[in-house]
Regions:
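Asp-based, Mg2+/Mn2+-dependent phosphohydrolase catalytic module
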Residues: 1-10, 92, 96-226
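N-terminal helical cap/lid subdomain that shapes the substrate entry/recognition surface
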Residues: 2-103, 112-116
Length: 226
């Protein structure tokens, strides 16, 4: 087998890629006064229909102003926060291994500017962190991926974008000329693992540990999803 060159840069999505979202939605359920399982099921239902996950909040409390509720949560000390325990267990080791390969490692996802600050505060072994809130444009907009290329400081074909949500992460990344890795974890990673969008990925993995190993061995073929 011919060993492929290690890509110059790799950029990671945040939610369900680096960070578990369990506590985030649990805190929203508690704030709204609905059972956690109820809100979790609503989130799954609206996203499966291709709608924004904020619609789950509106279904749980009809007529609610989500932006106003976010401000109220912040004022009450219940706003966005991110802790070490919110990271998936493989994150630090895998990011460190990728940097050790000489890759530029960055983070860029559909999050608020505040969430970007929280990710930076974790001190992950990455070169840079950016968010859609910072850029003023979100996935799957091609302009988001133009920013990703700038963040990577590498040509699109030498840059890998990693995410769990094929329609937001894989398809638009490939359309922008990047390489892409689909991470099969979190609700959306499992739900859409067999879609045409997921099949576009250059790599299809179940963990960041597996991805780092494949990068290190120069394996470029997509793995099958059984």
């Amino acid at each position: 087998m011919v060993r492929s060159p290690v890509p110059a840069a790799i950029v990671f999505d945040v939610g369900s890629t680096l960070v578990r979202e369990d506590r985030y939605w649990a805190s929203w359920a508690d704030w709204l006064g609905v059972p956690r399982h109820t809100l979790s099921a609503l989130v799954g239902a609206v996203v499966a229909e291709g709608r924004d996950d904020a619609e789950a909040i509106r279904l749980a409390r009809p007529g609610v102003d989500v932006r106003a509720e976010r401000r109220a949560r912040e004022a009450a000390g219940c706003g966005e926060r991110l802790e070490e325990s919110d990271l998936y267990p493989d994150v630090r080791e895998a990011l460190g291994a990728l940097r050790a390969l000489g890759m530029r490692v960055a983070v860029a996802g559909n999050q608020s500017a505040r969430a970007g600050e929280l990710v930076r505060a974790l001190g992950l072994p990455v070169d840079e962190v950016a968010t859609s809130g910072q850029w003023g444009v979100a996935k799957p907009d091609p302009r988001f991926f133009a920013h990703v290329v700038d963040l990577a400081r590498a040509a699109p074909h030498e840059t890998v974008y990693v995410g769990d949500y094929p329609a937001l992460d894989i398809r638009p990344a490939k359309a922008a000329g990047l390489r892409a890795a689909h991470l099969r974890r979190g609700p959306w990673g499992h739900l859409w693992a067999r879609t045409a969008d997921a099949a576009l990925a250059d790599w299809r993995v179940d963990s960041l540990t597996e991805l780092a190993r494949l990068m290190g061995t120069g394996t470029g073929a997509s793995r099958s999803v059984g």
